[in-house]
Amino acid sequence: MQLFHLCLIISCSCPTVQASKLCLGWLLGMDIDPYKEFGASVELLSFLPSDFFPSVRDLLDTASALYREALESPEHCSPNHTALRQAVLCWGELMTGCSWVGNNLEDPASRELVVNYVNTNMGLKIRQLLWFHISCLTFGRETVLEYLVSFGVWIRTPPAYRPPNAPILSTLPETTVVRRRGRSPRRRTPSPRRRRSQSPRRRRSQSPASQC
């Protein structure tokens, strides 16, 4: 707990441990869920095991490769882009603070505690945030929410009554693609009518020429 107060002193600019305790009490008194406005929740994300999420480095590389132009743009693209920007900046500031703590702590054991705490606790939260918003931008928010619900139902079902393999996010959009393909013939039905309607016009245009 003292280590957490030390992080609060650095990140929240609290001058003393007592002030950091007051800051901690204020933070814990607020019911803030970063996923609420997107239709999800921290509890829903907690159904996914910690080893499910890629490393922060892999997630940052993915975000940079797919959405770097939009993330660096001064324009507002979407709420997911904004949240992804904030998560990336938060991780950068956290790494800067940890580097400062590591350079100023002479005790190797204390430095190791800081690194382990950041990687196991704060690192997991950042990985969850990055994965959620990257997935929403890649597959669509509704698809991600459907996947979280499906995985939550699967993981809470006894092994004897559930499929052997967990749901896979990348396979969910295929069902929507199939549905769209099923609707496509209905959209294509007017095309023969257009061809039939065009044929009399051609005959009418040709009839004066034949009379002449």
From Swiss-Prot:
What gene is behind this protein? Answer: C
Q: Which UniProt keywords apply?
A: Disulfide bond, Host nucleus, Host-virus interaction, Repeat, Secreted, Signal, Viral immunoevasion
Q: How does it assemble?
A: Homodimerizes.
Q: Where is this region: Disordered?
A: 165-212
> According to the record, where are the sequence repeats?
184-190, 191-198, 199-206
| Basic residues biased stretches | 178-205
What are the residue positions of the site described as Cleavage? R183, S184
Presence of the UniProt keyword Repeat in the record: yes
From what organism does this protein derive?
Gibbon hepatitis B virus subtype ayw3q (isolate Hope) (HBVgbn)
Q: What is the annotated role of this protein in its UniProt record?
A: May regulate immune response to the intracellular capsid in acting as a T-cell tolerogen, by having an immunoregulatory effect which prevents destruction of infected cells by cytotoxic T-cells. This immune regulation may predispose to chronicity during perinatal infections and prevent severe liver injury during adult infections.
Q: What is the lineage of its organism?
A: Viruses, Riboviria, Pararnavirae, Artverviricota, Revtraviricetes
Q: Where is this region: HBEAG?
A: 25-27
Top-level taxon: Viruses
| Stated name of the protein | External core antigen
Q: Name one GO biological process term.
A: viral penetration into host nucleus
> Could you state what the record's PTM comment says about this protein?
Phosphorylated. Cleaved by host furin.
Q: Does the keyword Repeat apply?
A: yes
Chain segments carrying region 3 X 8 AA repeats of S-P-R-R-R-R-S-Q: 184-206
Family of this protein: Belongs to the orthohepadnavirus precore antigen family.
Q: Cellular location of this protein? A: Secreted; Host nucleus
